[in-house]
Amino acid sequence: MSNEWKEYVSDPRTICKYGAKCYQKNPDHHKSYKHPPNLKAKGKDRQRTRFTPYDKKPFKADSEDVKPQSQDAILDSVTNDDTCAEKLSDSTPSPNNSKEANRLIEDNHDNYYGKETNNNIYKECFQVEMPDDFFKFYECLNEESSSIEHLMASVNLEMIGPFDLLLGKLPKLDNKDLYLVHWRFFYDVPEFQAVLKKKGKSELHIGYFRDNPNDKPVFLAKNDSSKDCIITPVAENIFAAVYWFLQNEKSSSPFMSIACQKLSEKVKKWGESNGYKVEEYEKKSRIKIQICKTFHGAGIVVPYNKKTQIGYRKLVESNANIKKMFQKLEEASGEAEKSKVLSEIQPLITYSSIALDECDFGTGLEAGMALFCSGIQELQSSATSLLSSSYTLLKREEFAKIIQVHMKHRRKGPDVALWGNKIQ
């Protein structure tokens, strides 16, 4: 073994997946990944050239389906100068909203988790830990009533998701991946974790929003998946989020008014006495740190170097144009018409894939979210690939796992618990 190869073997950096075939010129890429000696030698004289997606040529869709399932699949297609046109794909199941289809487990379980407060269990089940205010809020309700669920029902609220673990309602499953789609609504991106829902057939839900799975949530937000994909920040902690809901709900019915007023006073007093401000979220603070707004409106935060401009570049198309293309695809009546629109959308996918390879991970994340938020079946395979790759490269592997499981079991409607519309 030559000295160069010995040095390569002992190099602690991550091995580049493309090895000797790597065409990457970005110095940041070579700092993070090691390459075989022969490539290393060749790379010294290379001039760094960043890809400019705006000097684009018209794309013509391939006649074959391309179904990238991983980061390798996406970037290999770019390496081979392939248009990687992605047409109708059977790899992602169609979203379901039937009651039977929404049920992922049977209701004959006799082994349940206890009322867990150990955050390791939450991490094991949901890939994220729960913040302190989550447990404090449960304490607040537990102090108020022996039946927390009845108390919440009196104000038209339902505790869902990780609260089922606190309530002792979560069954122990062999397939732990299914916990990742327990109460995950149709438009819930991996950053958004629902914890409360308006009772009944409403799809209005409130959840924690995290930019990074290993960080604390940055705010709680609301979404009504029966209407759209918009995620609207409402509060910094769950006390303020519930207070916001109660103030809005008490005006909806005279029968709700007294119960909502009573609980809102309790929540505000208990929250403030424990150091939680009961006030609406200041959206300007979010705008300052987000790299772009995204289709769902809550924005994304990724590392970005202003000097080198590495980390993010704008999408090749404006959001307005992307929405128009999505609408055309939804309205397309035949296979030929769909294929034509898909070929128009393809440059967005291809250029975002190239941006990923040049360390502009935020671009891949933004494009993947746009495809995800479209809710269009023909785009779901591309959405999964772009998002999985982006999260992995951003070292947010937990989010990559969540999106993969979600896309496999993506469901519409209000009954998105593991047990569907069955009452636990």
Q: Which residues make up each language-model segment?
A:
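Cys/His Zn-binding finger modules involved in RNA regulation
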Residues: 1-86
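Short, flexible beta-strand-to-coil junctions
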Residues: 26, 196-202, 209-214, 221-228
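A surface-exposed partner-binding patch
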Residues: 69-209, 343, 355-424
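Short secondary-structure junctions and interdomain/linker hinges
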Residues: 148, 202, 249-253, 274
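Compact, glycine/acidic-enriched structural inserts
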Residues: 214-269
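Charge-dense, low-complexity intrinsically disordered regions
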Residues: 252-424
